[in-house]
């Protein structure tokens, strides 16, 4: 099956890939560069809903979650589209987890939907929270 993509779709997918690449490299300055200056970021987190605005503020939020880990691994990431909205997902392993959760490996998965063109204008995220990694025997 083949598909043709209009320039807007290509731009959305490109900025989504840039966001994930910046996250994977923990390059929060580059991550901010994928965001519109007035980006709105709404997140459903384990403690409850949160809302932030502005590219630097949003980048700082991601830095607070992932920037301090000694060990950081991107396990999986995807870029897609749902009804004209960009869909991004990623699963990470970090050690230690932030917020004094624990020193061992923790896994986190996040799903995000974005309105995007050349930059991400709004980002709605659902977060699994940080969970101690369970190794099978």
Where are these regions (language model features)?
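A beta-strand edge to alpha-helix "cap/lid" segment located at domain peripheries
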Residues: 2-7, 60-137
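Soluble or luminal CAZymes and related metallo-dependent hydrolases
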Residues: 11, 15, 57, 105
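A solvent-exposed, acidic/Ser-Thr-rich amphipathic alpha-helical stretch
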Residues: 30, 34-83
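Short hydrophobic/aromatic segments of transmembrane alpha-helices and their interfaces
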Residues: 23, 40-41, 104
